């Protein structure tokens, strides 16, 4: 009876209480002092239902693990209790909070950690079993549970209960959006650990665990998309390295490649090097289907497994353009074979590498006029005055061909190019990547507007470009040359200024470039990449890890323990960065490091040649022909001379 009286007079403290006579219920029914005595007696006789138990953050912070152990957990796992728990209600709270208002995430994580660390497995089992009894919008609270391997099988059911209702996606997003980066990383760890353990156990596509994987991936995708908007963890942390992709596609090829909600729909969990392998496997399947169709229609004689181009070295661009522009997309994805007209030789990889190198050098010559070069950022951008759009289409095709031929290109674009290729909208701050110097000047305008009136500068809505020592002005908005920039319209000016240089002034050139690129690249696996990932696929990394190169190296007539091989790696690892690049150019014709690092570069060393002569190389096969030198000093002298004089020297 004391509890009933306290509930009526003081309330239970829960603004979400549903007890009709509890004072904490914003909609409670008032009882006068005269009615109080009779009401309490009658209510007690009729088995009065007590207000739900709930836990405040303040209580949790003062708890010890032993306090949690002694709690009647079941009492706190019903829907009404969860709605009220873990909230910092203000003293004057007079209405029911909406959604996750006043929620204290730290207290939830703390409580769940206490619970999992002190409870026995039977109690934890009760916790998981109780989730299905909770309203869908309250189930998200259980995303704060810690990951413990011994409870692995329960987490799949948890993710199912949380994500199976389509409406719940918005609830999940709302709950997660209120978390700190630290707490988001804990949820990320929970889901990532579950997926990692699942793939460690073997192929999941045809197992009864497959549906649970999909529910976990749906949740992981929400986190991934949130991370794109506001990064709380490095994007590589979403890679699940325990996935054995070849095992998955070998186990059920159609399910792997054709399932609308399979692994490839969540490709962000596949590390980049493996994803590129999948792109090539996907292409191999497409080519096989094309071949099968040709055989069925008696066109086999006309079918070639290669993209064969006859190129006039003296008319490189035009002959390349004429050979490529009218090719079907499926043909552009074939293995490239180059034949330079009038030259002897079969392309086993080296001739194609040379063609890529020559055409990139030609197209990116500043005096050729297609691109401008920023000496400070050391990057190229489209020249807005260039009018031969076919050349831009050609370089777009070349980028696509490079991907399908495992060629790393020696080009340097600002990262906004890859954003634009992937149809990711640009912002004003992206201009910082294109031209940091001008961006900083614009930011100074923004700072000035906080203390002064920028109209005093008499700026107008115009941008100026220099064309052969002639300044040309362009209006950023209609009538812009007559509109003064003020504090009120400054943000519009900044946005239009950045858009002019990043987009509108080079729209025709970029559109042609993108058209060429998309003529080759259509795989969702490539088009769903992050800009950083696509740049790595095209341009490679800058990590010159020669330990990784050594681990992957292959030998002929040498072994890893041969004295000459030991000499070579001691020398190679002691080289300066520039010398290491020259060594890679000497052996592979390229100093760029492929996706996944040097450990994924084919690198052969064979015993070949007279010890009195210099090393040579076959760039077609990434092979170094290393004579059996007597000691390290002689080898170093000969090797350094060879790599410093690599152009036209000893290359096969």
Predicted features along the sequence, with ranges:
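Intrinsically disordered, low-complexity, charge-biased terminal/linker regions in eukaryotic proteins
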Residues: 137-140, 154-157
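Long, Ser/Thr/Pro/Gly-rich and/or acidic low-complexity regions in intracellular
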Residues: 1-132, 147-150, 156, 160, ...
């Amino acid at each position: 009876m004391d509890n009933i009286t306290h509930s009526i007079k003081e309330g239970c403290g829960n603004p979400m209480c549903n007890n009709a006579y509890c004072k904490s219920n914003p909609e409670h029914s008032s009882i006068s002092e005269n009615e109080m005595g009779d009401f309490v007696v009658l209510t007690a006789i009729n088995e009065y239902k007590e207000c739900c138990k709930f836990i405040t953050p303040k209580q949790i912070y003062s708890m010890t693990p032993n306090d949690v152990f002694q709690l009647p957990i079941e009492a706190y796992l019903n829907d009404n209790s969860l709605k009220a728990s873990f909230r910092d209600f203000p003293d004057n709270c007079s209405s029911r909070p909406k959604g996750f208002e006043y929620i204290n995430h730290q207290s939830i994580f703390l409580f769940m950690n206490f619970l999992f660390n002190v409870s026995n497995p039977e109690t934890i089992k009760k916790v998981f079993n109780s989730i299905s009894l909770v309203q869908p919008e309250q189930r998200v609270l259980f995303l704060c549970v810690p990951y413990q391997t011994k409870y692995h099988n329960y987490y799949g059911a948890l993710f199912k209960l949380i994500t199976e209702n389509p409406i719940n996606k918005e609830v999940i997003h709302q709950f997660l959006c209120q978390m700190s980066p630290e707490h988001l990383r804990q949820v990320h760890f929970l889901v990532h650990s579950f997926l990692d353990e699942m793939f460690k156990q073997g192929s999941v596509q045809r197992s009864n665990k497959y549906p649970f994987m999909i529910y976990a991936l749906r949740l992981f995708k929400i986190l991934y998309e949130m991370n794109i908007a506001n990064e709380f963890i490095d994007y590589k942390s979403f890679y699940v390295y325990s996935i054995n992709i070849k095992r998955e596609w070998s186990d059920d090829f159609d399910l792997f490649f054709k399932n609308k909600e399979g692994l490839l729909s969540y490709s962000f969990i596949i590390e980049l090097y493996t994803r590129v392998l999948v792109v090539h496997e996907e292409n191999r399947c497409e080519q096989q289907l094309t071949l099968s169709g040709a055989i069925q229609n008696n066109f086999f004689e006309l079918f070639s497994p290669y993209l064969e181009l006859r190129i006039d070295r003296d008319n490189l661009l035009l002959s390349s353009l004429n050979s490529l522009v009218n090719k079907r997309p499926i043909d552009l994805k074939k293995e490239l074979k180059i034949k330079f007209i009038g030259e002897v030789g079969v392309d086993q990889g080296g001739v194609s590498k040379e063609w890529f190198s020559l055409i990139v050098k030609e197209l990116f010559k500043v005096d050729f006029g297609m691109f401008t070069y920023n000496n400070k950022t050391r990057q190229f951008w489209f020249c807005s005055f260039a009018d031969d759009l076919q050349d831009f289409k050609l370089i777009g095709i070349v980028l696509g061909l490079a991907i399908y031929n495992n060629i790393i290109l020696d080009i340097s674009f600002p990262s906004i190019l890859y954003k634009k290729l992937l149809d990711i909208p640009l912002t004003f701050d992206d201009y910082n990547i294109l031209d940091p110097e001008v961006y900083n000047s614009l930011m100074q305008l923004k700072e000035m507007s906080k203390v002064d009136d920028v109209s005093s500068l008499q700026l107008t809505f115009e941008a100026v470009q220099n064309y052969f020592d002639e300044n040309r002005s362009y209006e950023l908005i209609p009538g812009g040359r007559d509109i003064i920039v003020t504090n009120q319209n400054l943000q519009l000016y900044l946005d239009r200024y950045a858009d002019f240089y990043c987009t509108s002034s080079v729209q025709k050139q970029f559109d042609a470039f993108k058209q060429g690129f998309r003529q080759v690249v259509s795989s969702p696996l490539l088009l769903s990449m992050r800009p950083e990932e696509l740049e790595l696929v095209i341009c490679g990394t800058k990590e010159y890890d020669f330990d990784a190169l050594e681990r992957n190296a292959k030998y002929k007539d040498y072994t890893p323990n041969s004295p000459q091989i030991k000499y070579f790696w001691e020398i190679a690892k002691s080289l300066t960065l520039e010398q290491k690049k020259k060594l890679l150019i000497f052996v592979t014709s390229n100093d760029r490091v492929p996706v996944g690092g040097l450990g994924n570069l084919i690198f052969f060393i064979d015993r070949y040649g007279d010890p009195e002569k210099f090393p040579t190389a076959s760039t077609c096969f990434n092979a170094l022909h290393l004579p059996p030198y007597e000691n390290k000093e002689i080898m170093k002298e000969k090797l350094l001379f060879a790599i410093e004089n690599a152009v036209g020297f000893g290359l096969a």
